[in-house]
Design a protein with these regions (language model features):
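Asp-based phosphoryl-transfer active-site loop
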Residues: 3-19, 215
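Residue-level marker for buried hydrophobic side chains located in beta-strands
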Residues: 5-7, 65-66, 204
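Short beta->alpha connector loops at strand-helix junctions that form conserved
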Residues: 17, 84-85, 225-226
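Short, structured coil segments at secondary-structure junctions
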Residues: 58-61, 69, 163-166, 217-218
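Conserved acidic, metal-coordinating active-site core of Asp-based
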Residues: 101-217, 226
């Protein structure tokens, strides 16, 4: 089978300016890949709800989706192939460390929440993604959490979080870092999807730190310039 063609969303399929445009040339390229028999896949740090608000699911006949940096995998029709969730204690430790540093954390779960009032880092990230900010709520320690985002200064290394058990911290290009389950990545999600699609290799396109693992395991990888 031909390799899967795997695409990040923000900064790759679409821009990260105020317009958040998907160019006609991108849509045409996806169509031509599909017509040539390549499985086409979205691989994003966005949760499914956030992704669906972009409308990108409608620009091509996608074969599958990898959401939350590999923590949710679905087929092209949205049927769940696999889902990974944080251990509750890992979520609690992350929030406690963020509270010590007066940083906000978004929890992506059934209902997205944020742990403190949005600050300049949250608002800058919201502009970058054109995304929604959840209500301020305290985590109850019970709900399953699919993904976390920590908000901090642009270019910060998030060192205080790097030794926390059970998580992997991936600083982004704006004022945020994605937090994933340790050992789970876009690469592992693509490999899980590939078992269903019957393909064991892929080509990928991405632009940020959460794309590095995906690029390491690809047959070929293309890093976008922003």
């Amino acid at each position: 089978m031909k390799p899967m063609m795997c695409f990040d969303v923000d900064g790759t399929i679409r821009g990260t300016t105020d317009e958040h445009i998907v160019y006609d040339s991108t849509i045409l390229a996806l169509k031509k890949l599909k017509e040539a028999g390549y499985p086409i896949v979205v691989s994003t740090g966005r949760g499914r709800d956030s992704f669906l608000r972009t409308g990108i699911q409608d620009i091509a006949d996608w074969d599958g989706f990898v959401f939350n940096n590999g923590q949710l995998i679905t087929d092209g029709k949205g049927n769940v192939i696999n889902a990974h969730h944080f251990k509750n204690e890992d979520v609690i430790r992350t929030i406690e460390k963020a509270d010590e540093l007066n940083l906000a954390v978004t929890l992506k779960k059934e209902h997205r929440i944020i742990t403190k009032e949005p600050d300049e880092y949250v608002l800058e990230t919201q502009r970058y993604f054109g995304n929604q900010i959840g209500p301020v709520e305290k985590y109850n320690g019970i709900d399953l959490v699919d993904m976390m985002i920590i908000y901090g200064p642009k270019g910060w290394d998030y060192k205080p979080f790097l030794d926390l058990e059970g998580i992997s911290v991936l600083p982004g290009l704006s004022c945020f870092a994605d937090v994933a389950i340790a050992g789970v990545s876009k690469a592992t999600g693509i490999m899980e999807l590939g078992k269903v699609l019957g393909s064991d290799h892929y080509v990928c396109f991405g632009d940020s730190q959460n794309d590095i693992e995906m690029m390491k395991h690809a047959s070929s990888s293309i890093c976008m310039g922003n």
